[in-house]
Amino acid sequence: MTPANAPAPSPATPSATPYGTLPPAATPSARKPLSLPRLREMHAQGEKITMLTAYDATFAAVADAAGVECILVGDSLGMVCQGLTSTVGVTLETMRHHTECVANGLRRSHATAWLIGDLPFGTYHESKEQALRNAVALMQAGAHMVKLEGGGWTADTVRFLVERGIPVCAHLGLTPQTVHALGGYRVQGKTEEAAATLKREAHELQDAGAAMLVLEMVPAALSAALTQALTHCPTIGIGAGNGTAGQVLVLHDMLGMNLGKMPKFVRNFMDGAPSVRGAMEAYVRAVKDGSFPVNATHAW
């Protein structure tokens, strides 16, 4: 028996949860949660926006802790997680599942990152109503914004979603879902005609209400010009030079987990980094200070 005058036992010291999972009572971040007004403010002030892909709770929480502002649950998971040869086979249910995983991780770690979910191939092509149903599914899974690929033909869909309260990130240049139609993973907008088309489509998407625009494998000079011209739609580049409003990389690429030939626009941030979080922090610093990407090395 415990003596009546015995001191009360000390509260148990919280211990790490098993299997590397996130503690449900993590210390809230001092940073304010990201929002569309804040992202527009960063763009207006010339502060670079950082984005990485993530597909599960732990990597998403680590990315947020490293200072990454936007997390993209990309359909690239089809290639880096599922082993597919393109993103075409990724389903809405797969995207919904991974979006929910990432959202859970961000919530449990009191994260501040802005979460974007990719609408996969075939989920917004049939009609605006189809796009709405599927965008709602990703928003209900925890996304703050949905992303869809395509040029001017998507403008009406973008407007339809925005009018119904769903923020949209558009995607021009190399659009991996249409890689077969494009003839492979090729730089887009190299000719005068192609550049003019990209400019027109970018303005159409901004006018439709797109709040962000990914530019993939677009010549650096063209990307910089588009960024200057789009006054209220920040551009996020991947293989598009350092003149965009922000940068995004696929998580596995920037951690050097690519067993094949590394894309030209990628830097392995694990080189010299003490940890995955350290690599992500190095990425954030490099984007913020303009040392990544380097046009002569990582762009066209």
Curated annotation (Swiss-Prot):
GO terms for cellular component: cytoplasm. The keyword Magnesium applies. Residues 1-12 have a biased composition (Pro residues). It is found in: Cytoplasm. InterPro entries: Pantoate_hydroxy_MeTrfase, Pyrv/PenolPyrv_kinase-like_dom, Pyrv_kinase-like_dom_sf. CDD domains: KPHMT-like (cd06557). It is an enzyme of class 2 (transferase). Pathway: Cofactor biosynthesis; (R)-pantothenate biosynthesis; (R)-pantoate from 3-methyl-2-oxobutanoate: step 1/2. Mg(2+) binds at residues 75, 118, 149. Gene3D superfamilies: Phosphoenolpyruvate-binding domains. Residues 1-34 are annotated as: Disordered. The active site is at residue 216. The keyword Transferase applies. GO terms for molecular function: 3-methyl-2-oxobutanoate hydroxymethyltransferase activity; magnesium ion binding. Its EC number is 2.1.2.11. Its cofactor is Mg(2+). Binds 1 Mg(2+) ion per subunit. Keywords: Cytoplasm, Magnesium, Metal-binding, Pantothenate biosynthesis, Transferase. It catalyses: 3-methyl-2-oxobutanoate + (6R)-5,10-methylene-5,6,7,8-tetrahydrofolate + H2O = 2-dehydropantoate + (6S)-5,6,7,8-tetrahydrofolate. 3-methyl-2-oxobutanoate binds at residues 75-76, 118, 147. GO terms for biological process: pantothenate biosynthetic process. It comes from the Bacteria. Catalyzes the reversible reaction in which hydroxymethyl group from 5,10-methylenetetrahydrofolate is transferred onto alpha-ketoisovalerate to form ketopantoate. Homodecamer; pentamer of dimers. Belongs to the PanB family. This is 3-methyl-2-oxobutanoate hydroxymethyltransferase. It comes from Polaromonas sp. (strain JS666 / ATCC BAA-500). The gene is panB.
